[in-house]
Amino acid sequence: MIRQFCCVLLLVVHSVSAQLLEDIRQLSSADMQGRETGSAGAELARRFIGERYQSLGLASFDGGYQQTFLYAGWQEKAGVNMLAYRQGCLYPQQYIVVSAHYDHLGQTGRSIFYGADDNASGVAALLELAARLSEVCPAYSYIFLATDAEENGLYGSKAFVANPPVALSHIVLNLNLDMIGRAGKRGRLYLTGARRYPALMSQLHAEFSKLQFLPHSGPPRNVRSNMRYNWPEASDHGPFHRAGIPYLFFGGHEHADYHTPEDTWQRIEPDFLAMAMQAIWHTVQWLEQQPPAVLNGQRQ
């Protein structure tokens, strides 16, 4: 049985950037058709993400941002991850992978599953982090990984771990973002994987006065709707975890619009999103101040 501790960040009001909200709106627009893997809408989403990567001056591996892969469902299917990186200045050979899945459920008949919270919000936060880190010379190198086919079984992150652009031994941490735009049924944002970093938890507790710690345990999950019971396998950090790479996962609780056509950008909660972005950025700032031994020493 896997046992994992997570912390809960309750609502704190901060301002949210216009670009963050605009990226969510664009990615969850009707033109994207729900971003189902293999669809024309997913291709539009990739084009949007690639253009944002380019506008931020992010470098690519092997001359392009796309990482294609095959996976088996009812039949063999193809997916496409979007990769970019920012070279670090102090530890350039040590990488932090920031991940967020861009795929969603597509459409059924006339009903579009827009996927604003799940997971345009996470991709927008990834882009926000990329923008902030592009303004400085970060200590670590950062890979920005927008994954495909997460909804079908974490296939994008599995493909990345199976065929990484850098050696897995050089990846010190995965920071995964999934559903951070709404408070959900419990009004909370969850952070899991942080039990490895008690100093980080102490700082977050000081910054967010209503932070709590909750134990989460359960058998390995096969169905994503069980995410609240098995945090180590809840999203794209799962394959990193299984590869022995430490992870931090920010994600919200399910809400009434989860996996429905009502998950629209108009229902994103700016105050909650701003709080989540503040917590994520605080975490990155803490990571930037740690030597590799602190992160490397947490490998399983």
PLM regions and their residue ranges:
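A non-catalytic alpha/beta surface segment that caps or lines the substrate-entry region
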Residues: 35-86
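N-terminal signal peptide c-region/cleavage motif recognized by signal peptidases
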Residues: 13-15
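Acidic/His- and Gly-rich active-site-bordering loop/insert found
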Residues: 27, 53, 70-109
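Second-shell loop/turn segments in exported
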Residues: 30-40, 70-72, 110-119, 146-147, ...
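Extracytoplasmic/secreted proteins, especially bacterial periplasmic and envelope-associated proteins
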Residues: 19-26, 40-55, 64, 121-128, ...
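His/Asp/Glu-rich mid-to-C-terminal helical/loop segments that flank catalytic regions of hydrolases
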Residues: 131, 255-300
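Alpha-helical metal-binding/catalytic segments enriched in His/Glu/Asp
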Residues: 84, 98-152, 280
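Metal-dependent peptidase/peptidase-like ectodomains
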Residues: 137, 147-249, 295
